[in-house]
Design a protein with these regions (language model features):
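Short, functionally important structural connectors and interaction interfaces within domains
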Residues: 10-11, 162
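N-terminal secretory signal peptides that target proteins for export/translocation
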Residues: 1-7
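Bacterial N-terminal signal peptides
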Residues: 12-22
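OB-fold and OB-like single-stranded nucleic-acid-recognition modules
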Residues: 27-174
Length: 174
C-alpha cells in the first residue's frame, strides 16, 4: 500500500516536472497567445513544402483578394513574391516580414505577413534575423506553408488573415 502511494507521488511529480520544462505536451514560448495545439502544429511545421504541395494560385494578389478562411488550404504551401516593407522580431522569437507588391507600400490593406520561426532561423543562415533585416526594401520570393491567422481581434494591420507561416525559404526575386 505504501509502495503504491509512493509510486503514484513519484509518477505525478515526474510528469509535472516534464510538463514544466516542456518535454511533455506542447512547449509554450514567450508571447504564445494560447493558440490551439493544431495551430501550433501548423505554425511549427519542420519540412519544406514539396513541389506537389505548392498551391500555384496562392500568390500575393490572390492572398489579398481571397480573404476568407476557405479560400486556400492550410495543407498546402505557397511561393509568393513581394517587396519587404517591414521586418520585426516578435516576443515569441518569430520574425514578421511584411510584403507588398510595391516597395515602401504604406497602405496596410495591401500587406501580407510572412513569418520565420526560431526553428527555421536555426535551420538556414538565410533566415537569421541579421539576414532578414537586410531584405528591407528588396523584392523577394518567399516559400512556406499557408496559414490562416485566426486572431481577428489582433491590433496589427494587414490586408488578409492569410500568411506564409512558417517561411521555409527566402530568395531575392528579379
Amino acid at each position: 500500500m505504501l509502495h503504491s502511494r509512493v509510486s503514484k507521488v513519484l509518477v505525478h511529480s515526474l510528469t509535472s516536472a516534464l510538463l514544466a520544462v516542456g518535454v511533455l505536451g506542447a512547449q509554450e514560448r514567450p508571447g504564445d497567445k494560447g493558440e490551439t495545439a493544431e495551430a501550433k502544429k501548423l505554425r511549427g511545421r519542420p519540412a519544406h513544402p514539396k513541389p506537389s504541395e505548392i498551391d500555384s494560385a496562392a500568390n500575393l494578389d490572390a492572398l489579398l483578394s481571397r480573404k476568407d478562411k476557405g479560400a486556400f488550404s492550410e495543407a498546402k504551401g505557397a511561393t509568393i513574391e513581394g517587396y519587404v516593407v517591414q521586418v520585426e522580431r516578435e516576443e515569441d522569437g518569430d520574425y514578421h516580414l511584411t510584403l507588398a507588391s510595391a516597395a515602401g507600400e504604406t497602405d496596410t490593406k495591401k500587406w501580407v505577413i510572412v513569418e520565420v520561426t526560431p526553428a527555421w532561423q536555426k535551420k538556414s543562415a538565410e533566415l537569421t534575423g541579421n539576414n532578414l533585416r537586410k531584405l528591407l526594401g528588396k523584392k523577394v520570393r518567399v516559400t512556406g506553408w499557408l496559414y490562416y491567422e485566426p486572431d481577428e481581434d489582433q491590433p496589427d494591420p494587414r490586408g488578409t488573415r492569410w500568411e506564409i507561416h512558417p517561411v521555409t525559404d527566402i530568395k531575392p526575386a528579379s
